[in-house]
Amino acid sequence: TTAWNGEIGKKLIEDGNGFLAYNFRGQDKSKFDDKLNLDTDLIVSDLCLLIEKLKLNNIILVGLSIGGLYATLAVEKGIKSQGLVLINTLRKNNTRLKWINETMVNVARYGGTALLMDMNMPVIASPSFLEKMKSNALNPSNYKGLEKNSGIFKLMEGSLTANWDIDWSKIDVPVLVMTGHHDKVFRISDDIDEISNSMKNVQRLEFSDCGHLIPLEKPIEFAVHLNKFAKNLS
């Protein structure tokens, strides 16, 4: 939530919009029962419950990567959203995706998030963002496996329950699809084209100078596009 509480949030508020950023169960400062499986159903149910308890109206759900899938599943469960913003979310369920996802969990099991980030960054980030990250990366002393019952590991393990065979054509709300071209892991252009073209009401934004983490790489530009999307829906 750090980026949202910084430049992104400030820009949204300047334009008259509000925002709510929250941590999933298992993420920093978010309590959880370590006997629970932090699977897709639980994370989506938490999102729905949060929106209902806070009585949020006139909302746009925004999700990065699998977060976009969770947001879409919340809409499928009946959450009233004016629109969806999917950031490097669209992908097909196949052997390649399952291999990547399971390998990421295994890497985190043995080397923690530090090794996982060092392994992924060159193939998900833009060269300029990679340079910014380099000073705090590539330090083997940071490679410490995650405890089985730690929040982050349980979240990663739970993410393997996600069903990527969702019928995207059933989405009835306007969708903004953001894609970073330096994402060499999840960006399969033909698949994104096919899925996007199946949607009833979709806009697309291509970030040729970004990778997977668009909100971190270009926070102001990202917020400007969110404001524009929200304005067009009002």
Residue ranges and their predicted role:
Residues 1-32:
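Conserved HGGG/HGGXW glycine-rich cap/lid loop of the alpha/beta-hydrolase fold
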Residues 182-186:
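Acidic catalytic loop of the alpha/beta-hydrolase fold
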Residues 20-62, 224:
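Active-site loop/oxyanion-hole signature of alpha/beta-hydrolase fold enzymes
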Residues 210-223:
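Catalytic histidine-centered segment of alpha/beta-hydrolase-like enzymes
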Residues 171, 177-179:
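Short beta-strand/loop motif that positions the catalytic acidic residue
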Residues 72-76, 80-111:
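Flexible "cap/lid" loop of the alpha/beta hydrolase fold
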Residues 95-97, 113-169:
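Conserved alpha/beta-hydrolase catalytic His-Asp/Glu region
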Residues 173, 187-195:
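Short alpha-helix in the alpha/beta-hydrolase fold that links the catalytic acid
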